[in-house]
Amino acid sequence: YLYSRQMVLVRADSDIATLADLAGKRVAVQATSKPETVFLERPEPERVPKVGEVYCFSSMEEVYSAIRKDFVDAIAGHEGAMRTFMEDSPGSWRILDQSLLVSGLGVAFPKGTNEILSAQLTAVLQEMQKDGTTKAIVEKYGFDPDQFFLGRGGSS
């Protein structure tokens, strides 16, 4: 139904402008997160360079502290978490245009169960997209609808 994006955040005055610019840099992530996997296992080495150090913390608060105190050059996490963090200090931070990772989201039920509920949920979500409700919700929370909906972008 929707896309979920993992993004990279840097200081507003950072010289890091693209994922390629992360080569050799220090990056903080939350342990066991998708960004941790991307930086440590590098499933797409042509898109995501080898960084200098990956610091894995148990909470996003620790990740935020690492960049606030200049211990790292960048942090990575879910777009919503990055945007919420930015609200505390407008103008101090920016999110890179390139997504670190884009995942399609949906709702799943065990096979052979909840067919009626599944059909009802699908119908309601489709109606919400048609009448603009979903777009309004996405915009209310500071996201770009063109990057959020399956079939409408989200590939950056």
Language model features by range: what are they?
Residues 12, 30-33, 59-60, 76-83, ...:
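Beta->alpha turn/N-cap motifs
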Residues 35-57, 86-90:
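Ligand-binding cleft/hinge of the Venus flytrap
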Residues 20, 25-26, 31-34, 107-145:
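Extended ligand-binding regions for polar small-molecule ligands
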Residues 3-5, 22-24, 34, 69, ...:
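Extracytoplasmic
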Residues 2-10, 87-125, 144-156:
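Periplasmic-binding protein-like
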Residues 14-15, 54-65, 103:
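Short helix-initiation/N-cap motifs at beta->coil->alpha
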Residues 15-26, 152-156:
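Immediate post-signal peptide segment of exported/extracytoplasmic ligand-binding proteins
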